Amino acid sequence: DEFGTTKPLLECVTSGVLRGAVAMVGCNNPKVRPDSAHIGLMKKMLENDIIVITTGCAAQAAAKAGLMDPEKAKEYCGAGLKRVCELAGIPPVLHMGSCVDISRMLILAAELSKDSGIPISQLPVVGCAPEWMSEKAVSIGNYVVATGIETFLGVDPYVKGSSEIC
């Protein structure tokens, strides 16, 4: 197959070596210290044997923190993820493109679904934008929600109405 196969990843998940994957996207938000939500959440995922795929500003945050360097990042990984990364020669956080390349992540989820026979909504994957700050993050999130994948936005949107509106 020209693009490879998802079978090794599926075997890691079904055997319990990996617990799943998180697709993390989004720019920094002025409401929080830059990169802090991205990096804090990524480190928590890694220690729990959850591989992270990321794009755009979230990917830049990971790179700046050394999470895309296999040697530097392995200290944050649980035993299962550390072993997978060592065997495959990959970092625990994988860069998948620019900020609006969520389609690449969803193509991967669709391939995992096809190869496993499990609906996308039942795969151990989630989407999140821990520091989102723009409308494009909401539209990307809606795309992920439409597939049935659980999706989380980290900063509450300012949606309070005026006291003049009943």
Where are these regions (language model features)?
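Anaerobic metallocofactor- and corrinoid-dependent redox/one-carbon enzyme cores
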Residues: D1-C166
